[in-house]
Amino acid sequence: NDFLASGIGLLIDGHDEDVVKSVLTRDKNMAVSRHKIGSSVWSSLGDLGPAMGMIGTLIGLVAMLSNMDDPKSIGPAMAVALLTTLYGAMLANMIAIPFADKLKIRMAEEELIKTVAIDAVLAIQAGQNPRVIESMLRAYLAEGKRAKPEE
């Protein structure tokens, strides 16, 4: 883990707790900020998909209504009107929104991992007992995933 390695590197270089915490927290916050931007792009695309579908529907309906004197042109224009709505809904609900949700999950996971690393590095710097550090870090795990402490 490069993040943890950089934290340990700061300890080895002899920086005090405030510097280590500040550098690592800034790194974590910037990563979260970058992930939020990516997620918001996909969320916006999910919001725009149905709207773009409705615009296509309006274009198809205008084409259909402008050629009412030709019955053969009504079907293809109606198909365009209906398909654009379908494509907009599919783009939003099958691609953009799930992708945005997955990015949000990954962002939360990375934020947690970096928070654990910051706590571990600061505990090491404070000279805490390894068993205390271990029990402190176990608190981040769900109870079912915690290994039983060795006696």
Where are these regions (language model features)?
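Large intracellular
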Residues: 1-38, 109-151
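Helix-termination/interfacial motifs at the ends of transmembrane alpha-helices
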Residues: 27-106
